[in-house]
Every structure is written in structure tokens, then in C-alpha cells.
């Protein structure tokens, strides 16, 4: 038995050593964080397994008001079923500037943090807009090569910061969440990703076509960091988080404390009420309580499609024309949503453990998004 144990230990050492030698050391962290905790993919509370940087809350927090009929309207049976089926942890409806309805599940509450996943892309795009206003970046057409000389040659020389925000970079990136060997998986678990990011090639002409790639926002975050001389967390806190009166500290996952690079394409841990604020800021054309935090023209451009053949995306925001309404939304893995109707001034926030794996015919969006919209409006219109 002792010889068997020693042999098994040596075999494990060889396997682990081989994994590192082949450049797949990040897989060991993936196994420890995901599979060893009983999950099959990244999850809402996984930020506790990573190094994070704090996005400091406002020193003058602005609590949301509540409508006179707050939580007076019952949820529809269809909405309740969706919550149960997809593991909702937070559901929030804001009318105007006030919370009209909210519910929490699974021991979450209004202060509980959970992972934004790709909703963070909307924050990074907003920071791009702010860097232009602040003079750090000249405009959407400024070349990425102005910040990183690795992009001065060939197709890469045509790459602009606007191409990164609108998902039109031509970057060689595999957007596969469940493939352990994909670059997306490596980016999530690799502790030193900065150099790897700058080694990736541009393989098709930038600015010509939409292709959703998390690497675009990762590189855009690095551009913003380089342009401002500040970490993304620091710049987000001073430019938007604090001016919007966010009540809680947020956390932004890092590749590692040693490297200190925010995962710009994902992974801000906060709560439903504070996530809703960016939706309100864009709903109000970049203005917050009378102060212009983002240029209104930039906001307007962000929530309209850049490419007519891909009307579902603008600059960092998902777009949905549904039942005569133009919605724009923040959207993240496993069904994290901030859905905005600028006409009715309604914001719907949903956070949770999973989403539908089906989509209506002809739609690029999962069916649960339509459920949350439809059932919220049944409640608002008194049809619950």
C-alpha cells in the first residue's frame, strides 16, 4: 500500500509538471475553482477564489427611492416559474428614478455581491467614452498602435479603439466558454495574461464586420489603463461609480495580484441596485442628476448598431427591438441582465445562476430575456 501511495504521488507530480511544461498550468486553477466546488462552469460567487481590486463606493451615496406602490404587485406565475427554473438570485424593476419591484432568492439580498460576467463590457465601453471626454484618447478612430506598438504592422495597423468596443477587431480569439483549451478559458484562469494578450494576432481586416470576442474588451481595458495611467478599478471609481452614488464597494477580478490586470471583459462583483445605475446613466443620455458624466453623442452612438447586418450590438451594449420598443442591455454569462427601455424609463435587472438554452426563431437572444421583459410589463400594466 505504501509503495502504491508513493507511486501515485509520483505520477501526480509528473502529470502536474507536464501540465505546466506544456503551458496549461491555468487548468489546475480551473479544476480547483470550478469542478472541485461542484460546478461545471464559472459561477456567481467565484470572485472569492480570485484576487480582486476594490472599486470604492461613493462617499456621498445616493440610495434609490421607492415608488408608493413598491412591491405591491404580485409577480406573474410565468415569471415565478422562470425564477425557479433558471435560478434567479435578484430581480429588480425600476420605473423612472425609483424601485418599483424587487425580489431576492437563495440567501441573496440587496447588498449581496455577484459576478457581472460580461456586463462588465458595458462599463469598459463607458470608460472609453469618458477617456475621450477627459482627453486621454482622441476618439473612436484612434489606432490601438498609438498605445501598443505590437499593432503597428499589417492588418493590426488599421485596428482602432472603436473597433474593440464594437466587436469588429478581426482578432484571433476563440470565444469558447466550455473548452478548457480555448483562449477564453485561459484568460479567465491564467495568472499572467498581459503578455499573452499582446501576442495575439489580427487575422482579418478590422472595422468591417461584427464578431463577439471577449479579447476585444480585454485589449480595450489595457488601452484605457495605458492611456490614463490608472487601473481600470481606480478610473471606474472616480469617473462613474462614485459620481453615480453607488452604495457598495465593488470588486474587479484580476488575473493575479502580482500582474495586477483587471479582467476587463468580465467579472465586476456588485449588486443589482448598483448595476442598475449604469443603465440609468445611459437611459438619461450620459447625465446623472444634472451632471454630464458621459458625452450624450457617445451614448447615443453606443446604443445603436454599427453594422446593419448585426443590429444586436452597438458599442459595448446589446440591442433588441421588440414589440416596437428599442431596448438596450448589459448582458453576462449565465443570464446577468440590465435591460433598459429608454422610452418608458423602465429598467429590469436580473441576476442568476443560469439562462435558457433556447432562442426564439430568428433571434440571437435566449428566450428568458423575452420572458423577463414580457412578465415585467404584465405586472406594470396590471395583468399579473
Which residues does each PLM region occupy?
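Short, small/polar residue-rich loop motifs at catalytic or cofactor-binding pockets
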Residues: 85-88, 112, 333-334
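Active-site-proximal alpha-helical segments within enzyme catalytic domains
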Residues: 216-223, 264-287, 336-352
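Catalytic-site signature segments of enzymes, centered on catalytic residues
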Residues: 111, 178-258, 262-263
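A short acidic/small-residue loop/turn micro-motif
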Residues: 105-109, 113, 354-356
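Active-site Gly/Thr loop motif
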Residues: 248, 253, 299-347
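N-terminal leader/targeting segments and the immediately adjacent pre-domain N-terminus
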Residues: 1-108, 137, 369-384
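Active-site helix/loop module of the DD-peptidase/beta-lactamase fold
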Residues: 134-172, 199-201, 228-265, 270
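Active-site SXXK
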Residues: 97, 115-140, 164, 220-224, ...
Amino acid at each position: 500500500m505504501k509503495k502504491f501511495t508513493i507511486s501515485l504521488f509520483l505520477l501526480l507530480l509528473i502529470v502536474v509538471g507536464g501540465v505546466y511544461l506544456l503551458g496549461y498550468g491555468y487548468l489546475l486553477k480551473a479544476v480547483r475553482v470550478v469542478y472541485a466546488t461542484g460546478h461545471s462552469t464559472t459561477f456567481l460567487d467565484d470572485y472569492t477564489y480570485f484576487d480582486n481590486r476594490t472599486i470604492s463606493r461613493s462617499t456621498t451615496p445616493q440610495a434609490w427611492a421607492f415608488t408608493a406602490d413598491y412591491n405591491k404587485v404580485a409577480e406573474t406565475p410565468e415569471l415565478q416559474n422562470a425564477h425557479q427554473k433558471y435560478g434567479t438570485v435578484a430581480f429588480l424593476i425600476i420605473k423612472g428614478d425609483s424601485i418599483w419591484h424587487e425580489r431576492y432568492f437563495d440567501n441573496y439580498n440587496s447588498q449581496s455581491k455577484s459576478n457581472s460576467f460580461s456586463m462588465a463590457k458595458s462599463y469598459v465601453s463607458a470608460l472609453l467614452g469618458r477617456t475621450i471626454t477627459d482627453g486621454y484618447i482622441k476618439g473612436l478612430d484612434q489606432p490601438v498602435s498609438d498605445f501598443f506598438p505590437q499593432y503597428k504592422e499589417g492588418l493590426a495597423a488599421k485596428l482602432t479603439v472603436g473597433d474593440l468596443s464594437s466587436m469588429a477587431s478581426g482578432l484571433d480569439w476563440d470565444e469558447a466558454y466550455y473548452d478548457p483549451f480555448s483562449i477564453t478559458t485561459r484568460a479567465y484562469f491564467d495568472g499572467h495574461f498581459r503578455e499573452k494578450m499582446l501576442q495575439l494576432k489580427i487575422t482579418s481586416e478590422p472595422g468591417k464586420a461584427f464578431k463577439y470576442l471577449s479579447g476585444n474588451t480585454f485589449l480595450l481595458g489595457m488601452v484605457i489603463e495605458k492611456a490614463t495611467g490608472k487601473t481600470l478599478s481606480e478610473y471606474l471609481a472616480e469617473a462613474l461609480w462614485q459620481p453615480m452614488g453607488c452604495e457598495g464597494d465593488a470588486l474587479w477580478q484580476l488575473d493575479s495580484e502580482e500582474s495586477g490586470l483587471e479582467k476587463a471583459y468580465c467579472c465586476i462583483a456588485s449588486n443589482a441596485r448598483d448595476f442598475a445605475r449604469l443603465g440609468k446613466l445611459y437611459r438619461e443620455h450620459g447625465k446623472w442628476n444634472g451632471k454630464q458624466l458621459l458625452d450624450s453623442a457617445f451614448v447615443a452612438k453606443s446604443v445603436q448598431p454599427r453594422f446593419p447586418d448585426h443590429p444586436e450590438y452597438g458599442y459595448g451594449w446589446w440591442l433588441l427591438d421588440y414589440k416596437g420598443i428599442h431596448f438596450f442591455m448589459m448582458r453576462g454569462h449565465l443570464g446577468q441582465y440590465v435591460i433598459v427601455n429608454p422610452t418608458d424609463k423602465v429598467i429590469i435587472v436580473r441576476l442568476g445562476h443560469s439562462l435558457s438554452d433556447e432562442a426564439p426563431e430568428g433571434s440571437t437572444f435566449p428566450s428568458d430575456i423575452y420572458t423577463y421583459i414580457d412578465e415585467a410589463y404584465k405586472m406594470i400594466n396590471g395583468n399579473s
